[in-house]
Amino acid sequence: QPQNLRRFTSVESYFAYNLIDVNQWGNVPWISMENAFRFCSSLQVSATDIPNLAGVTSLANMFESCVLLNSPFNLNAWNISTVTNLSGMFRFCYSFNQALSLWNTANVTDMSGMFEESGFNQNIGNWNTSNVTNMSKMFKKAISFNRNIGNWNTANVTDMSEMFGSAAIFDFPMIFNQNIGNWNTSSVVNMSGMFRNAKFFNQNIGNWNTANVTNM
């Protein structure tokens, strides 16, 4: 492995489509994985080891548009305890549906668009979301997702816009229908389109504190 390699990005690069596999992560002390495999539409990961993310704060858009990605590459064992940004990490990963329940998300502040238009439907109800401020578009058009996330700590979230929404009435409807009535929404300012086209959602959210909401 190159001795000075600390960061990798494929965004808008010529070889993105031709990158088809990561077979080993090695001992590289990464400083960022932001945009690392973005638009690598043929990518799978066969590596059995895990990357060294001890110095990484952003995984934003790491696998965005990796439309075939769904190989079981020990993702659940990744140490993301230093990560603050997960925005768009699996956006447009239509095939992706791997376990992430063991992730330490205690320091994450941004989960916007994380699973947007992905095939994800795994248990993440135990995630620590106490520091998250942005959940906008987190599950937008993630039409398979229907898991219990009712115990999430949303006290610091300010943006939930389009969180469970779809773009238009012609899209496949969201099937999400879980009890999130106990969420603390006292900090939320933006809820615009939060349940747009969520035709199956039928839960009581009447006790939500919407005192600070300016956009519904």
Predicted regions, residues:
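Negatively charged
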Residues: 1-215
